[in-house]
Amino acid sequence: GRGAGAKPTGDRAPIATLARVAHHAIPRRYPRSVRLAILAAVLGLALTALDVGGCSGDPPWLVAGIHKIKHIIIIMQENRSFDSYFGTYPGADGIPARNGHFTVCLPDPRINGCDRPYHDPSLVNGGARHGADDAATDINFGKMDGFVRSAELERNRGCSATYPPPQVCLPSGPPDVMGYHDAREIPNYWTYAKNFVLNDHMFEPVASWSLPSHLYLVSGWSAHCKNAEPSSCTNYVGIKPEKSPDQSLGHRHGHHPDQGDRLSAAFWACVRAHGVEPKQIQRPTGLAARQRKAIGQCLAILTPAQRQRVLDHGAGGGGGEGLKLGTYSWTDLTYLLHAHDVSWAYYVQEGVQPDCDQNPDETAAGCAPVAQGASTPSIWSPLPAFTDVKANHQVHNVKNLSSFYRAAKHGTLPAVSWIAPTQSNSDHPPANIATGQAYVTNLINTIMRGPDWNSTVIFLAWDDWGGFYDHVVPPKVDSNGYGLRVPALVISPYARKGFIDHQVLSFDAYNKFIEDIFLGGARLDPHTDGRPDPRTDVREDAEVLGDLFADFNFNQKPRPPMLLPVHPPPGPASTP
């Protein structure tokens, strides 16, 4: 098999160098298929001369059958740890247990005792804070025992008796961060794992919240830029840019983000609790009488000045929908895709997202909803704010989700697709996880029904841990990460059946797979990609990073579609 982080050695070492040189030497005027064919021929001759052809260290683009993949789709959900979704999945590296009983018990300062993992039948969860400081608290220098303590802190923040609080603010009982789900609540996710590939060591790329994870997903880095010049960018993962997070060791730096306006946070939580969308504040037509009455009650929380701003400007007056992302001047993956004539699209479902812009360490309990859509740069859709996307006139490649359904139906999917949800189907607390599962199932069913299924790879993952317990210490690859472990699945007609991939992986592995499939191994490397930026490492080349090619058998007969019900019945219970 293909080992994690395998590097060319001995006679194969020059092959990797030759691959890079040949890749950049082939004129771009040739179509991509021709360039890859030339590259394969050159490397094939070199391998023959060295008598190492067919070794496991061969460049990925020489793997037999790789040409069968024409479409890579990344579906990104939100805020779940691996143990919270697959902690009791048979054969996976799940919650530690012995003789049918969990062996972990995390300190709980509320009771001066400890809390054990438990099956949580609730479809609506609270989670906990999930910023950089919270990751440090949860990891706690590798002890992985700070999750309950971190969640308990939230009980004293952003909670008000004037509206029904989310579960995270309830005054009694253990926080639900120790709860786990199984096939009883998420049967389709478990069915996909049973029939395709489950990655049980997929780590979020950075020990922080949603925005840095989504930036890594499309660019292999998270930074703060002073202007449009790549040289102005400095490392940034959700704490002060001048600080070095080193979160995988649990170091804290004394920086606590501004807690924001609690009255405003309480107002937005109040209207959300009554099922009112931000845009309906100014235009309440269609709302039930009880909802219109609730808006008036919620407005009473605010000061007169705040009330007027909300009535005048809607969600923007509350600090939520007026999200302004920074300028992202470093190089993202679409720059390489565009340079190699590889089509791409970033599909965004219109609606709202719950994460805060100025206050990333809050949960949904303390955030104003943030509007998102194809024309609105957002935390879950950052590409419109990248300067190279604008310079290449590629902003139109960020599309509404309806465009994805049409493309999948008619066989016109681009080579690379990313898909971002809206709040209600994202799995991000307090979203109903059955709603999220139905949304994901519908996406996958649509792909499977379409003409592109036999040439497609689907990667399904969750962007960060959301404050939920996980027992595996994240590997350290640089000062930013990795972050905590998240669920991940590989679905394809060429995916191995029922395979659990134990390799260390991160979202960098998705970029690496895209680069190997479509770009002949070109990397987001400031020394070779033609657009230098100050990033200090090439994440795709991390020694510990595994290889997603291990999840496939390109020689097998393409597997037929496996259409699942959007609203499945509960599956069987699992055991520790």
What are these regions (language model features)?
Residues G1-P14, V21:
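Compositionally biased, low-complexity flexible segments
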Residues C55-G275, I281-P576:
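N-terminal pro-sequences and low-complexity stem/linker regions of secreted or lumenal proteins
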Residues I26-L39:
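Bacterial N-terminal signal peptides that target proteins for export
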Residues A37-D51:
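Bacterial N-terminal signal peptides
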Residues D11, T17-A19, R28, A305:
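Serine/threonine-rich, low-complexity intrinsically disordered segments
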